[in-house]
Amino acid sequence: MIAGISGRVLKKSGNVLLVETKSGVVFEIVCDVQTSEEVEEGGECFLHTFLSVSQDGITLYGFSNERKKELFLSLTKVSRLGPKTALKIISNEDAETLVTMIASQDVEGLSKLPGISKKTAERIVMELKDEFESAGIKDMRIYHESLEALISLGYPEKQAREAVKHVYREGMKTSELIKEALKFLSQR
């Protein structure tokens, strides 16, 4: 198992990196979009990795932090959801928001991600909700109302989700959550 790789990024092509280690070995690593954007060609990096061996071949997946890797591994445990789909999910939403969506059984939010059908979202929630149970927003009605309010005010959905997740505290009313989220967004 290759748990991590440290080295210099020789080439970036989309979300595929060529990383040369100090010993001269060059690894081809498939990353999520955010990780690929964080590293620079010619720069040094450390990636948490997972080696996938399947009938299609051997693929090395890389992540900028351990949390993303753990989430990726959890997603690959879901029946009929392979590493490519798991990587696509992680590339389209930040790890904390995904954990919150799964823990709070937000099938609607998950099914809005590219390539994720309602059935797949339901399967993800059903198979992983217990694993992430303590991490979610408890009252999804307040979450969705606040999110919709921010979107209707013109904020992009991803920014609105991040703001709501960041300021949420258990027991908040919708109006309080919207107010705090707007404060958070105005400081950015």
Swiss-Prot record:
Has three domains with a flexible linker between the domains II and III and assumes an 'L' shape. Domain III is highly mobile and contacts RuvB. HAMAP family: DNA_HJ_migration_RuvA. It holds the Pfam family HHH_5. One of its GO terms (cellular component) is Holliday junction helicase complex. Residues 143-188 are annotated as: Domain III. Belongs to the RuvA family. It comes from the Bacteria. Keywords: Cytoplasm, DNA damage, DNA recombination, DNA repair, DNA-binding. One of its GO terms (biological process) is DNA recombination. Residues 1-64 are annotated as: Domain I. The RuvA-RuvB-RuvC complex processes Holliday junction (HJ) DNA during genetic recombination and DNA repair, while the RuvA-RuvB complex plays an important role in the rescue of blocked DNA replication forks via replication fork reversal (RFR). RuvA specifically binds to HJ cruciform DNA, conferring on it an open structure. The RuvB hexamer acts as an ATP-dependent pump, pulling dsDNA into and through the RuvAB complex. HJ branch migration allows RuvC to scan DNA until it finds its consensus sequence, where it cleaves and resolves the cruciform DNA. This is Holliday junction branch migration complex subunit RuvA. SUPFAM superfamilies: DNA helicase RuvA subunit, C-terminal domain, Nucleic acid-binding proteins, RuvA domain 2-like. Residues 65-143 are annotated as: Domain II. It comes from Thermotoga petrophila (strain ATCC BAA-488 / DSM 13995 / JCM 10881 / RKU-1). It is found in: Cytoplasm. Residues 143 are annotated as: Flexible linker. One of its GO terms (molecular function) is ATP binding. Homotetramer. Forms an RuvA(8)-RuvB(12)-Holliday junction (HJ) complex. HJ DNA is sandwiched between 2 RuvA tetramers; dsDNA enters through RuvA and exits via RuvB. An RuvB hexamer assembles on each DNA strand where it exits the tetramer. Each RuvB hexamer is contacted by two RuvA subunits (via domain III) on 2 adjacent RuvB subunits; this complex drives branch migration. In the full resolvosome a probable DNA-RuvA(4)-RuvB(12)-RuvC(2) complex forms which resolves the HJ.
